[in-house]
């Protein structure tokens, strides 16, 4: 919209920057409010001013020069009436910011005026266009009074003393609507300044006289008003202050008009009441400018457009205008707007941290976010500060309520971040605590030195708590209740205690495992020695270095004693190491109870290993062979035909057979009963957990639910296995016996006595030659000494045995090669066939003879063959 060649923002215009250059139409002649008012205030940089702005409205009859006065006084460009026409120019309500006023000397009076003066040009009254329709007149007056600090009444000097000409009808309307407003807002009781500018002032009538005339007329109008209850005795000066100024004729005295306008403009600045100077009412007189703080409607500049629109909406819809309610509604609206704007900046600062935290939680790996605490504090401080800066100007109760709501929104999100940060610190702290303790324990184990597990846990726990508190303090936001992290710290400490206890139990489990391995090693060596002694039936083999061979009957006594001693030593080691873990008595008791059960399992597994069929049969055979092949002195026997092989064989076999029932049951020789395993292990400790029992092997006679008795637990070889061992051992023993018998029979052949005489006669010359030759004699002497030493060492038997074995092997090899040679030729095959025929014819006689000479040897042949097979296995 263009007025006087200048651009204005009209209602409904499509706007760009130049439309706001000289002002804006607030309300058009059709009573439509301009929604672009806020854009104009932003364009003029008034919005950030807060309360540092002033609003002036001008009233007066149509075509009396109101717009001209404003343009001259404030440098605005409101539309003015053409000098060639007499018609309405200002339609509706217009608003423009003061543009400054240049003096003739080039000085800028803007430096003397207050900042951000908004000038509102109101449509003139008593115009022919509206005639008797005073609705817009009343509504515009109410709007101006509700929003403006200063109401300029533009009248001519010759109109003073008139009713309509002096706008007394309009002022009566102003007073009436003012009473309505004040009735709604008795607490604040806002005041306004009625500034009468008397145009075409000649000076003939003093300004003071004109002032008195106007005040008398105003008081008369005020007294004639029908006042609400409680305001019957109120005075006009309770609600209004008055100021007066005269201006010369613009056309007849242009230079003087300009000078007076410049002087008048200097009054539009901030003023104050001087309590030392009182006016007729008894209040302090106004000093300085005309803008007093009590005139200001206390509507921040950024909310003025919304406030004005709300006021006009109430007015145009003929609703009772309630300024406090409008101020509250404005405060709610603006506080919500400011809150949203503040939250945008808050989102930019906090959303990245929320996204990172949510992503880490979704990935199952919460992370401690660096810089979160400072970001939270800065974001909250800036948000609240920015809100306070913008919103604290509005209604205090609404401002406080909206501030609390904003803080709740901010704190809700910050609390979630805070708790997420503590949760991540909790989880990472627990993990680092576990890893640190484990690493320290491994380092102590690698050094080979003893380490104090309790001290390690105490040290790492202290470091973990310090780190958690450091993270928590770094994330704390001051002046917030939710920043108290003592509950989370207490929970963290409890979890550290739980994890520390779990690590201690795990370490005790590992200690128990190491002790168990130590027990297994010691038991393995000791039990091997005891069972190896069973495999030797001769003195010296399984006997100690000094003393006699231990009795086979006391085998289980020795095993039990060794077992008890080793486990007691292990318990001592376990208790000593457990003391460095700061373990409780209950935990030590559970550990010892588990150690005893595990140790019995190790012993039983070792015994079962020794009792395997192959192992026990081998030991029985070795025991029998030692008793059969060696004499009581441990010397190997050389079987001769006159030896009582049958008796020796029977004694050795029966002695070895007694081991099978002995080994079949774990019994102590003194009591002939199983050892007190149930009492030795003891009852299950009351502090034992299911986890302590889940990896334990049930033990008969100890665990009631196992269904096995102690006698069954101590049975090492079942009846079926005993019988099988007996049969197989006898077969093995029979084979050894047959071998011995063959050896004795093979030595029956003797050299005839005449052979020695023949040897002496035929070898006499050689004997004499040897005796006469020193070399031969020396060789003979050495051979004789060697034979004597061999005899003294009782080595002739083994030498002969080895010689016979070598000769037998050579004979067998010769026979094999001869057979291969014969099979390779036709003549050899014919000779072998003839030899086999003769052997078949004489088989019966030879077999009969063998039966007679061996005394029933043929009846035992099958047993001998089976024994040979077992011996080969």
Swiss-Prot record:
Intrachain S-S bonds: none
Encoding gene (name): SEY1
Protein name, entry field: Protein SEY1
Localization per record: Endoplasmic reticulum membrane
Annotated region described as Disordered, given as residue ranges: 677-701, 841-873
Cytoplasmic side: 1-750, 796-873
GO MF annotation list: GTP binding; GTPase activity
Annotated EC: 3.6.5.-
Protein task: Cooperates with the reticulon proteins and tubule-shaping DP1 family proteins to generate and maintain the structure of the tubular endoplasmic reticulum network. Has GTPase activity, which is required for its function in ER organization.
């Amino acid at each position: 919209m263009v007025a006087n060649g200048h651009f204005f923002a009209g209602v409904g215009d499509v706007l760009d920057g130049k439309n706001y250059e000289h002002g804006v139409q607030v309300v058009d002649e059709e009573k439509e409010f301009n929604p672009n008012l806020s854009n104009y205030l932003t364009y003029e940089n008034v919005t950030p001013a807060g309360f540092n702005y002033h609003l002036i409205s001008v009233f007066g009859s149509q075509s009396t020069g109101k717009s001209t006065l404003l343009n001259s006084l404030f440098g605005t460009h409101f539309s003015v009436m053409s000098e060639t026409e007499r018609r309405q120019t200002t339609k509706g309500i217009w608003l423009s910011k003061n543009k400054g006023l240049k003096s003739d000397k080039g000085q800028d009076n803007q430096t003397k005026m207050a900042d951000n003066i908004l000038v509102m040009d109101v449509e003139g009254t008593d115009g022919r266009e509206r005639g008797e329709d005073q609705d817009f007149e009343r509504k515009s007056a109410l709007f101006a009074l509700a929003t403006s600090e200063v109401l300029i009444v533009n009248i001519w000097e010759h109109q003073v003393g008139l009713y309509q000409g002096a706008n007394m009808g309009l002022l009566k309307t102003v007073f009436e609507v003012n009473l309505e407003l004040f009735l709604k807002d008795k607490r604040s009781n806002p005041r306004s300044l009625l500034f009468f500018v008397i145009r075409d002032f000649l000076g003939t009538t003093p300004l003071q006289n004109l002032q008195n005339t106007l005040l008398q007329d105003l008081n008369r109008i005020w007294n004639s008003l029908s006042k609400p209850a409680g305001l019957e005795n109120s005075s006009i000066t309770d609600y209004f202050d008055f100021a007066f100024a005269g201006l010369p004729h613009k056309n007849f005295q242009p230079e003087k008009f300009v000078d007076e306008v410049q002087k008048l403009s200097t009054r539009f600045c901030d003023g104050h009441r001087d309590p030392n100077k009182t006016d007729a009412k008894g209040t302090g007189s106004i000093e300085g400018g005309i803008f007093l703080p009590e005139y200001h409607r206390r509507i921040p500049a950024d909310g003025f457009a919304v406030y004005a629109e709300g006021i006009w909406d109430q007015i145009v819809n003929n609703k009772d205008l309630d300024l406090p309610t409008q101020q509250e509604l404005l405060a709610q609206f603006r506080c919500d707007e400011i809150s949203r704007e503040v939250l945008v900046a808050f989102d930019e600062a906090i959303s990245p941290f929320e996204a990172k935290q949510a992503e880490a939680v979704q990935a199952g790996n919460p992370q401690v976010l660096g810089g979160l605490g400072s970001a939270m504090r800065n974001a909250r401080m800036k948000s609240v500060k920015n809100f306070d800066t913008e919103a604290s100007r509005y209604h205090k109760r609404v401002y406080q309520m909206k501030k609390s709501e904003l803080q709740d929104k901010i704190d809700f999100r910050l609390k979630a971040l805070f708790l997420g940060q503590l949760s991540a610190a909790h989880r990472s702290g627990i993990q680092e605590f576990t890893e640190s303790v484990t690493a320290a324990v491994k380092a102590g184990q690698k050094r080979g030195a003893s380490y104090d597990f309790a001290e390690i846990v105490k040290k790492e726990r202290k470091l973990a708590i310090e780190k958690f508190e450091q993270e928590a303090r770094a994330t704390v936001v001051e002046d917030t209740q939710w920043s108290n992290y003592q509950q989370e710290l207490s929970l963290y400490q409890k979890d550290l205690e739980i994890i520390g206890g779990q690590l201690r139990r795990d370490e005790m489990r590992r200690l128990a495992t190491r002790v168990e391995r130590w027990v297994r090693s010691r038991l393995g060596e000791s039990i091997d020695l005891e069972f190896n002694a069973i495999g030797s039936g001769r003195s010296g083999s399984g006997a100690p270095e000094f003393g006699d061979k231990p009795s086979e009957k006391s085998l289980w006594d020795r095993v039990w004693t060794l077992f008890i001693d080793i486990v007691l030593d292990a318990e001592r080691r376990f208790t000593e190491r457990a003391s460095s873990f700061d373990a409780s008595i209950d935990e030590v008791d559970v550990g010892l109870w588990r150690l005893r059960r595990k140790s019995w399992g190790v012993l039983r597994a070792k015994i079962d290993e020794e009792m395997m069929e192959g192992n026990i049969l081998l030991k029985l055979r070795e025991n029998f062979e030692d008793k059969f092949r060696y004499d009581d002195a441990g010397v190997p026997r050389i079987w001769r035909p006159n030896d009582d092989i049958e008796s020796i064989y029977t004694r050795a076999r029966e002695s070895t057979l007694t081991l099978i029932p002995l080994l079949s049951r774990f019994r102590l020789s003194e009591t002939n009963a199983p050892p007190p395993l149930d009492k030795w292990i003891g009852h299950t400790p009351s502090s034992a957990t299911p986890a302590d029992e889940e990896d334990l092997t049930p033990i008969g006679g100890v665990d009631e639910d196992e269904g096995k008795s102690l006698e069954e637990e101590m049975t090492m070889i079942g009846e079926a296995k005993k019988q099988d061992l007996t049969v197989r051992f006898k077969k093995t023993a029979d084979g050894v016996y047959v071998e011995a018998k063959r050896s004795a029979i093979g030595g029956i052949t003797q050299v005839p006595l005449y052979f020695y005489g023949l040897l002496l006669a035929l070898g006499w010359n050689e004997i004499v030659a040897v005796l006469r030759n020193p070399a031969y004699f020396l060789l003979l002497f050495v051979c004789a000494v060697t034979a004597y030493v061999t005899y003294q060492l009782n080595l002739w038997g083994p030498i002969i045995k080895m010689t016979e074995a070598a000769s037998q092997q050579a004979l067998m090899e010769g026979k094999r090669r001869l057979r291969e040679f014969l099979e390779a030729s036709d003549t050899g095959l014919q000779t072998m066939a003839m030899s086999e025929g003769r052997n078949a014819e004489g088989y019966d006689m030879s077999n009969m003879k063998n039966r007679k000479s061996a005394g029933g040897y043929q009846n035992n042949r099958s047993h001998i063959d089976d024994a040979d097979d077992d011996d080969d296995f």
